[in-house]
């Protein structure tokens, strides 16, 4: 087995509850969280150590998006601080970004999130809402543009559709935080997807 210390978590209801359950499984102050859709590069170093001289934070690595070619922290491996994770009770739109975090510009692998129509749409919808909500930068504008273009590969049309639907929804609710936060729940996203498909 490639990663003998890896622990699998499944069957937990709720996004925040899943993060908390993963944190509680950790025997150390930091733990890596890896989505099952990430194809981890053999060269990725799981022995990365947090900077103990800094305040506690989460470390976000880069992952490649096979649909639009972007490489950044979206759906990447993340080294979570166990205690910050547990203390995140009412996160914002993004659980990880709700606490101090640092980006580590090292590629961990490729995130093959585009495996079903619903997940392809949902992942794009959520990510584009986050990009719409953040203060615009040259980088965030570029990412938003790439998400909204037709990419390549399986369900590329639904990835684009999810992105465009998110831009439309953001405008429709005028960036209202409560309306945006509805997308945190999988049941709401499922209903939204079913209403457009």
Q: Language-model features: where?
A:
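Short beta-strand-to-loop acidic/aromatic patch adjacent to the donor-nucleotide binding site
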Residues: 22, 29-42
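Short, solvent-exposed coil/turn elements at secondary-structure transition points
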Residues: 12, 37, 64-66
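Residue-level signal for functionally critical sites in structured catalytic/ligand-binding pockets
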Residues: 18-19, 35, 72-74
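N-terminal anchoring/stem segment of glycosyltransferases
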Residues: 1-27
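Short, surface-exposed beta-edge/turn micro-motifs
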Residues: 28-29, 75
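Catalytic-site signature of metal-activated, phosphate-bearing donor transferases
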Residues: 47-197
């Amino acid at each position: 087995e490639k990663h003998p210390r890896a622990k699998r978590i499944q069957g937990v209801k709720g996004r925040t509850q899943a993060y908390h359950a993963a944190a509680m499984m950790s025997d150390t102050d930091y733990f890596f969280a890896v989505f099952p859709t990430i194809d981890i590069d053999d060269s990725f170093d799981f022995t990365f150590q947090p900077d103990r001289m800094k305040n506690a934070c989460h470390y976000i690595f880069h992952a490649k998006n096979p649909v639009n070619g972007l490489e950044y922290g979206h759906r990447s491996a993340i080294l979570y601080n166990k205690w910050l994770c547990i203390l995140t009770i009412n996160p914002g739109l993004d659980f990880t970004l709700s606490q101090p975090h640092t980006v580590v510009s090292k590629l961990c692998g490729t995130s093959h999130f585009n495996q079903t129509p619903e997940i392809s749409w949902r992942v794009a919808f959520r990510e584009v809402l986050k990009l719409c909500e953040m203060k615009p930068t040259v980088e965030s504008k570029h990412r938003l543009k790439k998400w909204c273009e037709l990419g390549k590969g399986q369900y590329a049309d639904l990835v684009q559709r999810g992105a465009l639907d998110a831009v439309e929804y953001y405008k429709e609710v005028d960036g209202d935080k409560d309306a945006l936060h509805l997308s945190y729940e999988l049941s709401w996203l499922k209903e939204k997807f079913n209403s457009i498909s």
